Structure formats: C-alpha cells, structure tokens
Amino acid sequence: MDKIWHMGPRGDYTRKKRAGERLNLTPKPDLALPGRTEALPGLKGKGKEQGLRKITEKKELSRLTGSSSQRPSLLSVTGGEHLQENSPGQETPEEKTPPCETVTDTFEMDSLLSSTELVSGPAEQDDFSSCLPSCSNAELHTESTDERGSSFPSPELFRGSDCLDWEHPKLEDYMFYKNSTLLDTSKAVVIEKAPQFANLSAVLSSSSKNYEKRHRKIGMTLAAQHLSPEPKYASNLASVVDNAASEVVFAEKTGPPTTEKTQKKPENESEDSGPLVQTKLSSGHPDNKALCSPLSSALESTAVRYTLLPQPLEPVLKKGCILPDKQSKALLTSTPSSDIAEFVIDLSPVQNVSFEELFPNVSNYVNSSEVVPVSSLQESSSNEFSPNTSEICCIIRSSPGTRQMRRKDPAVKNRCSPPKDVPLDIIMKTNGRT
C-alpha cells in the first residue's frame, strides 16, 4: 500500500505518504500540542526520541495562532517525518531494522496518533474556549485603561510632579481629592460650621443715618446758593475771614482783659438790634438805602471791627471789606443788572450773631438770616442805578453761535471769462489739443 487514508476525530480524511517521499509542507502554528507529546512515550528506539525532540521544537515555534481543523494533518506530517527517519535506506551504525518492522511500527504509530487525537481533541477545544475569555479580558482591560486615561478631569494633572501631592502619590487618590480646577476640597469647611460674623446692623444703621444727614446738609446748601448766589470774590473774603478768626482766637488768649469788657457791650447791643433787622428781612421790602448803599455797609463793618476785633486786624479788613466809592460805582455801572446783586454786601445781620459764629472755621455753610430775596435787590438796583442796555446787546451779539457769512467775489468769475476778440470755436479746439 503506497498511500494510507485514515479518519480524524471530526470526520475529515487526511492523506499520508509512505517512507522515502519528502514532504515540503511547513507546520502551521497550533495552540494545544502538550497532549500530543504526552501520548507518544509508547514508541521505541532512538529514532523515536529524535521525533519527540522535533515535536517539542515545533511546539515552541507554533504557539501564536492556528485552527483546529488542520491539527490531524500536522500529526500526519510528524508521522511521515518519523517514517522518513526510520526508512530502510537510512541505517544507523548502532542498529539496523528490517523493512517489515518499519511497516508494523508505522501502523502502531498511526493507531497511537489517532488515539492521542481522540484524547487531545476535547482538551484542545477547552483550551481554545479558555483562550477566548482571556483575550476578551485583555481587550476589556485595554479599553478600561483607555477610558481611564481619557476620563482625566484636565491635562493640568500631567504638567509636572509639582502638581501632585506627596501625601497622595497615587493618581487615583489625587483625582479623588482634586477636581478639574486643582482646588483642594479635602480641607473645605461646611458653611454651617464656619465662624459667625459680628452683627453689622448697628454699623449699617449709623452709616445710613450719617448719609441722610450729609445729604440733607448738601441739599440745604444748594438751595441757599440757588436763592443767593455767591459773589465772585467770595473765596478771597473766606480766606481773609479765616485768617482773621485765627488771629482773633490768638489775641483772646494773649490779649489784655480790657478787650473782654469792650466785647460784652456790643454783644448786648447786637442782641437788641437783632429783632429789628429780622423784621426788615421778613417783610420783604427793606429800605433801599440800608441795603444797597456801600457807605452804610462800610459804616456797619467799621463798627463791628472796632468793637470786636483787636488793632492788628484793621489793615486786613480795610483791603477786604471796604470798597472805595469810585471803584464801586465803576463796577456797578459796567456790569448788567443781574450781576449788581453779587457786589452788594449787607453786614446788618452780623450783629445778631455770636462772636464764634461770626468767624467760623468752615465757610461752606450759609446762615438763613443772611439770605436776602433777589427780587428786592433787583428793584433797589433798578431804582438807584440805570443799567446800560447796549452792553447787554453787545454780549449777545458776540456769542459764538452767530457767524458772519462769507461773500463770494464776483471778480473770480471774470477771471475765467473768455476774451472778447477770440471766438468760442477756436477756444474749444485749443482746449482739445492741450
């Protein structure tokens, strides 16, 4: 028999060749060869040991991947090689075997191989089935690692070793205590356990009351300024009065006691004359001479100066409060009627004010007794001084809103006119050439 057919464990037929024929088939990888190597110890001779060694070598080379349907062919290949090694043409010096023994040995080996395939078939299936869950577990492990790498809160964790805590060197612990903004939430405190702040209601109420008082004072000062506008030289007078007040306070401390006696008398007199001045202001029709004449105001200011102030303050008040007759007339005649009220100074209400209120440290507030209605001042000024209406018209005309219109020069048009001697046709031709 040249060819032997034998049936595998799954019903597929494999073809085996006799001794002396070489096979050029390369063994394909297989996963479960340990059963095959365990079933071959029944063979005898050194040639069989050489076959066992080659089977183990092929087992080491064929551990990657393979199909179970090609395993009987691999077994047949190993058997053929074994037969080829024990062929009658090849004789070892130690032992010579006749050809009849080799034929019987091949039959025995085929039977043994078939039995080993029957035994090792279920084991190989079990190995293959056990390999599948291991591969699936490996895939799941790789997927979980990829998901873990992609589920990091932010790339800020991988900036360097400074970001990681030495107390928690593991990344999982670090992620447990850190969020995406790298805030340490482990040391956070609940709001209920936080220390209570002090009661700020008293502070807020006091600040609101102070704000209301200040707002009222500002409103009163604005209303007083709206009723009686401040004079243009009010800042100069305020500075002079402040300096005078400081000098008066210094003179009280160092001055002789005779000044105190002289101060008490005019205060009593001022208290007596105070109601008369208040009745005049409340009536709304005061005398024109008492309000507007600079001579009466000068006399009153000199009386207050001699009674209340020491000697060194006389030149200061002469420069600041008393206006000469010529300068006052020039100012009043050169200004319109609306500006006349600013230059009138009435010092009559000063008499009913105490010495401390006469020279206050702060000159931003206006006393209500000093407020004079503007209508009465305008009536008195219209009776005493005649305003110059032409100057008012000049001021209106010199406003920046009105501008003179520019006139076009008729001579400019004559420059472009053609000459009288040359006709129009010739001019058109010359223009076309140029």
UniProtKB/Swiss-Prot annotation:
Residue ranges, annotated region (Disordered): 1-102, 249-289, 404-424
Tissue: Germ cell-specific. Expressed in both testis and ovary. Not expressed in other tissues.
Region of interest (Required for localization to kinetochores), ranges: 391-394
GO biological process, one term: male meiosis chromosome segregation
Knocked-out gene: effects: Infertility due to defects in meiosis. Mice develop normally and show no visible phenotype but are completely infertile (both males and females) due to defects in meiotic chromosome segregation during meiosis I. Monooriented kinetochores split prematurely and sister chromosomes separate entirely before anaphase of meiosis II.
Keyword Cell cycle among record annotations: no
Subcellular location: Chromosome, Centromere; Chromosome, Centromere, Kinetochore
Key words of the record: Centromere, Chromosome, Chromosome partition, Kinetochore, Meiosis
Comp. bias intervals (Polar residues): 64-76
Entry's Gene Ontology cellular component terms: condensed chromosome, centromeric region; kinetochore
Tagged with keyword Lyase: no
Entry-linked InterPro entries: Meikin
Bias (Basic and acidic residues) ranges: 46-62
Major localization class: nucleus
Motif POLO box domain (PBD)-binding in this chain: 334-336
Subunit structure: Interacts with CENPC. Interacts with PLK1; required for recruitment of PLK1 at kinetochores.
Role: Key regulator of kinetochore function during meiosis I: required both for mono-orientation of kinetochores on sister chromosomes and protection of centromeric cohesin from separase-mediated cleavage. Acts by facilitating kinetochore mono-orientation during meiosis I, when kinetochores on sister chromosomes face the same direction and are thus captured and pulled by spindle fibers from the same pole. Also required to prevent cleavage of cohesin at centromeres during meiosis I, possibly by acting as a regulator of the shugoshin-dependent protection pathway.
Protein name: Meiosis-specific kinetochore protein
UniProt organism field: Mus musculus (Mouse)
